[in-house]
Amino acid sequence: MPGMPAHPGALYTAEQVRDLDRRAIDEFGIPGYQLMTRAGHATLDALRALWPAAKSIAVLCGPGNNGGDGYVVARVARAQGLRTEVFCLDDPRQLSGDARQAHADFVAAGGHCRLWRGEPLDVDVIVDALFGTGLTREISGEAAELLRAANVAQRPIVAVDIPSGLHADSGAVLGVAARAALTVTFIGRKLGFYLGEGPEHVG
């Protein structure tokens, strides 16, 4: 979110955002996977607008719907001719719901994700789709190491909806958080973007 305004207007808690998301699905009949697809396209569009010379990206996909957004980004990026590396934390066959569909469509289009084993992220832009607004616990283990690797890679990071590891309501860092150059957020701006350590991480 480059150039965040001093007076951002309406801000939302994570629960309010989830409620609005449910309303879009239940009351307006928008399929959840359609919302996920829109999010993935919007993220890639914003990335390419800011870094039009980028030829390669790494997409870091987590175990939930944020990871599903990442698989959409990866599928569309491959279709547009970008060299696309996809790293996941867990076996994607354990995904469920819309995220499972996003991964299936990515694989059907010829994509492949692999578990991160400490290799450097040698690409033009990194896409952070590890954890979304539902995260409330501290990040540890391999997920923390992957985020640290992204932060020290000296590559711009594009966060999908929220930088992984940032508490959506308080702006607290939950162990470690992505330091994004750009956050492409959906439905509404989160309180945590403007509180605590949020401004240092959202871009």
Please state what every model-predicted region is.
Residues 1-56:
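Positively charged, low-complexity intrinsically disordered leader regions
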Residues 12-15, 30-42, 68, 97, ...:
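Conserved active-site and cofactor/substrate-binding residues in soluble primary-metabolism enzymes
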Residues 22-25, 29, 111, 131-132, ...:
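A broad detector of the eukaryotic-type serine/threonine protein kinase catalytic domain
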Residues 44-130, 138-160:
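Nucleotide and nucleotide-moiety/phosphate-recognizing core
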